[in-house]
Each structure stands twice: as structure tokens, then as C-alpha cells.
Amino acid sequence: MDDEEETYRLWKIRKTIMQLCHDRGYLVTQDELDQTLEEFKAQFGDKPSEGRPRRTDLTVLVAHNDDPTDQMFVFFPEEPKVGIKTIKVYCQRMQEENITRALIVVQQGMTPSAKQSLVDMAPKYVLEQFLQQELLINITEHELVPEHVVMTKEEVTELLARYKLRESQLPRIQAGDPVARYFGIKRGQVVKIIRPSETAGRYITYRLVQ
């Protein structure tokens, strides 16, 4: 892949990551959300083949709007298939900086032992992997994807009381659903899905993540 194409891909991927962080409630500036390809090149370079940028230069650290101590790393490993050694390096950095959540943007995937290490570290350290291919477009901007809103515990309690339901009676959505992964929705959370409706203006459904 030539430098121009690779620079474009890295810009698109980082832009989606910034939108994802923002949509999860982390503090991202408008400049970062709106960064143009030219601005990306000025900041990071346009010769990936010569290490400008190296993927590690794209690392992101964001703090949550509601709680500045709730921080999240986004790592961009160099190797196409990520091994356990890299995961250990990331975990050590997270321990040193007292950060418990991270996203890892991988080119081709992870080795089985690296994948297993993510499972072993949960729930103390939550590391989510995304294939870079998934981030070339922002799935939530697709016109067929309705708006998803993660509900607070209080909102869920109120919802169940209003409709006299038990949580187990709610319809389900898989934690592996692409939109659920984008928002980092965990098992046991409830998501409100808002669709436009020609008759009712908007049509709201609720899903329990499993």
C-alpha cells in the first residue's frame, strides 16, 4: 500500500476513534473531531513507510466528561497480528498510570494467547480490540443504524416500574453487536433504540445486552 493511501486510512481510523470516544462520553475537542486530512498530515506526517507517522504516534488518552479520573487509552500496535508481549507492555503502562480501560486497534487480529490474556485481565482491566477495517467508517453514521442510547440504572428501574416488567422480559441485543461494541455497552446494561417513524414521529424500543 502506498504512503498516500495508508495516510488516508490512518486519518479515517483515528477520526472514527475520536468520534467513538466522544460518543462514549469522553472529552474530545471539536478540532480533533473535525480534523482534516491536511491537518492530520501536518501533525503526524504523510510517510508511514518511513515511520512518519508510526502507529504508536497515534496513541490517544482521553478522560471522561463526568469523571476526569475515568480515563481510557487507545493503542495502535505496529505489528499486524498482535501477540501477548505487546498486551503485557500495554497492561504495564495502564498499571503505571492507573488506567483500567483501553481500546486496541489491530491490523489483522490477535494471537490466541493475546486474546486469552484480555479475558484473564477482565474485569480489573478492560481491553477491547477493534479491527482497523471496522473503523474506516463510523457505523453509527450509517443511515440505516438508529440512534442508540445507554440507559442509567435509575432510568432502567423507572422503565421497568412503568411497564411492570422484569429485566429478563426485555428483548435482547448481543454484546458483540457492532453498535454495542462501538459504544462499549456491557452485558446487563439496557440500551434505548430510537428509530424515526412515519406515523409516530419516532419509535422507541429497549434491549437488554447479553
From Swiss-Prot:
This protein's name: DNA-directed RNA polymerases I, II, and III subunit RPABC1
Compartments, record wording: Nucleus; Nucleus, Nucleolus
BP GO annotations: transcription by RNA polymerase II; transcription elongation by RNA polymerase I; tRNA transcription by RNA polymerase III
Gene Ontology cellular-component terms listed: nucleus; RNA polymerase I complex; RNA polymerase II, core complex; RNA polymerase III complex; RPAP3/R2TP/prefoldin-like complex
InterPro entries associated with the record: Arch_Rpo5/euc_Rpb5, RNA_pol_Rpb5_N, RNA_pol_Rpb5_N_sf, RNA_pol_subH/Rpb5_C, RNA_pol_subH/Rpb5_CS, RPB5-like_sf
Position of the Glycyl lysine isopeptide (Lys-Gly) (interchain with G-Cter in SUMO2) cross-link: 81
Protein family according to the UniProt entry: Belongs to the archaeal Rpo5/eukaryotic RPB5 RNA polymerase subunit family.
N-acetylmethionine carried by residues: 1
Entry keyword set: Acetylation, DNA-directed RNA polymerase, Isopeptide bond, Nucleus, Transcription, Ubl conjugation
